[in-house]
């Protein structure tokens, strides 16, 4: 549905050229909720704005539904953009228009007849839960409701793609969850492809199918969300996941473990489980089979894409030969085993 090929973006700054994006390649299938995450300045917003050519790339191509947007004329591009809705962190509603009027605005500008506008807008307001607020003005509704208006307005032209640029970052956690639930429902009911930009891994965990991690304008990691959480490879990904699922021990415990590791006593492990593995007595079975001691230092259970996900930090001790066999057994059971070290 969306394909980004060899895309780079440069801007001229006071100290010379700045490369905001470097050779980005992504493929986003139709009907997927795809997350793009990174720290501030990673290039996320620049990337999402190239998908509808609000920002034209310096190099590369952007294909949406098989059409290369970079090769379209101005008129053709305007037509193609009708298939791409967009919502932003700031709601950009007209204070002089009602909720209905704000959602209807793009249709009015496109010359759509009044009867057709009503037939389009009223179901959208019902979809986003604002049918009862249709005659209210922006000053009379909450921030979460304003974002729902923005979503309905973005859907008014019946797009195939919805771009979300930090759409929940200005909202409180409860409202954020409600908006994410709404986006997921829209994805399911309308078959809409959603590209979601965020700096919050919690958002990725709750709503996305796949994720790309952006750092300094480069895609440093990409994959299914559950796989990225279980097997993060890049240090930026690890740091972002650590914002949601603790990856580090408390400092005092870390110091004690480091001293113990220096003596060669034990192995510090991060174990990650998913699905049925969370409910199975895998650790106790490993202890019985291989006569190991597991000291659990830290643990957490969460849910990703509706599947249970568990993460443990353990200190394992036992006979060297049996330790290796135990690690192999754990991996056979679908457990991700990562040996850590805090020794400087």
Curated annotation (Swiss-Prot):
Q: What is its EC number?
A: 7.4.2.11
Boundaries of every ABC transporter domain copy: 2-241
- Its protein name is Methionine import ATP-binding protein MetN
The subunit field of the Swiss-Prot or TrEMBL record says: The complex is composed of two ATP-binding proteins (MetN), two transmembrane proteins (MetI) and a solute-binding protein (MetQ).
State a GO cellular component annotated for this protein: plasma membrane
- State its location(s): Cell inner membrane
Q: Which CDD domains match?
A: ABC_MetN_methionine_transporter
Where along the chain is ATP bound? Answer: 38-45
What InterPro entries does the annotation carry?
Answer: AAA+_ATPase, ABC_transporter-like_ATP-bd, ABC_transporter-like_CS, ACT-like_dom_sf, MetN_ABC, MetN_ABC_transporter-like, NIL_domain, P-loop_NTPase
Q: Which UniProt keywords apply?
A: Amino-acid transport, ATP-binding, Cell inner membrane, Cell membrane, Membrane, Nucleotide-binding, Translocase, Transport
Record keywords: Cell inner membrane included? yes
Top enzyme class of this protein?
Answer: translocase
Protein role: Part of the ABC transporter complex MetNIQ involved in methionine import. Responsible for energy coupling to the transport system.
Q: Which GO terms describe its molecular function?
A: ABC-type D-methionine transporter activity; ATP binding; ATP hydrolysis activity
Which source organism does the UniProt entry give?
A: Burkholderia thailandensis (strain ATCC 700388 / DSM 13276 / CCUG 48851 / CIP 106301 / E264)
- Predominantly, its location class is membrane
Pfam families, per the entry:
ABC_tran (PF00005), NIL (PF09383)
